[in-house]
From Swiss-Prot:
GO biological process terms held by the UniProt record: proteolysis
Official protein name in the record: UPF0758 protein ABC2615
Record PROSITE patterns: MPN, UPF0758
Sequence motif JAMM motif, residues: 175-188
Record keywords, A-Z: Hydrolase, Metal-binding, Metalloprotease, Protease, Zinc
Binding-site positions, Zn(2+): H175, H177, D188
One Pfam assignment: RadC
GO molecular function, one term: metal ion binding
Domain called MPN: residue spans: 104-226
Length: 230
């Protein structure tokens, strides 16, 4: 039998938990249930939210789903599908607006945090470069390559062409591992070596190469790889 919202203790209902503990304490299911507001006669908003999220392996895939796909979930009509899509779009706009303020990169954590949300749930490797000025402000962020990264795909020419065009003082490169494990591969080390060497010739330092996993990351510089590939 499906649990209805009235069967959930009042203190454990999503809205009450939101008020008491804040949004960050809630699960994805609870956040979606709040946006849905109501369920059906047979299913609570929590159950509808659970069914919806089960249709999409990742939040990134859900965020890209067309209205027609969202409406296939029992309990979600056109109005609720539009409300969910509007909430997602608002989140995107907030993120874009935030990025208009040039962030300062003072640690690998800063760089990883800047791209981790965009990389979450991606099914292919994405290679991103952050171009910095002399004060380590990000003046440009660009996805340069998509696919299985190796030395033949990630060419220093493309990385540093953007650096020269934007008059960057340094570059930080990042890419994701869809497996969720950020451990560097031999190809990652090889690519980093070529980029370090090219940057040294051009006078544009590669400050770091960061691999982003599932809720974690590895800085090749912090792990000591830069000392062996100078």
């Amino acid at each position: 039998m499906t649990l209805l919202i009235r069967d959930v203790p009042q203190t454990e209902r999503p809205r009450e938990r939101f008020i008491r503990e804040g949004a960050k304490a809630l699960s994805n299911q609870e956040i979606v249930a709040i946006l849905l507001r109501t369920g059906t006669k047979q299913s609570s908003a929590l159950h509808v939210a659970s069914t919806l999220l089960s249709q999409f392996p990742t939040l990134a895939m859900f965020s890209e789903a067309p209205l027609e796909e969202i409406q296939k979930v029992p309990g979600i009509g056109m109005a609720k599908a539009i409300e969910l899509s509007a909430a997602i779009e608002l989140g995107r706009r907030i993120q874009r607006e935030t990025k208009l303020v040039r962030p300062v990169i003072s640690s690998p954590e800063d760089a990883a945090e800047l791209v981790s949300e965009d990389m979450r749930g991606l099914q292919q490797e994405h290679f991103v470069a952050l171009y910095l000025n002399t004060k380590n402000h990000v003046i440009k962020q660009k996805t340069l390559f998509i696919g299985s990264l190796n030395a033949s795909i990630v060419h220093p020419r493309e990385v540093f062409k953007e650096a020269l065009q934007s008059s960057s003082a340094s570059v930080i490169c990042l890419h994701n591992h869809p497996s969720g494990d950020p451990s560097p591969s031999p190809e990652d080390i090889s690519v980093t070596k070529r980029l370090r060497q090219a940057g040294a010739i051009l006078g544009i330092e590669l400050l770091d190469h960061i691999i982003v996993g599932d809720g974690c990351f590895i800085s090749l510089k912090e792990r000591g790889f830069f000392a062996t590939i100078s």
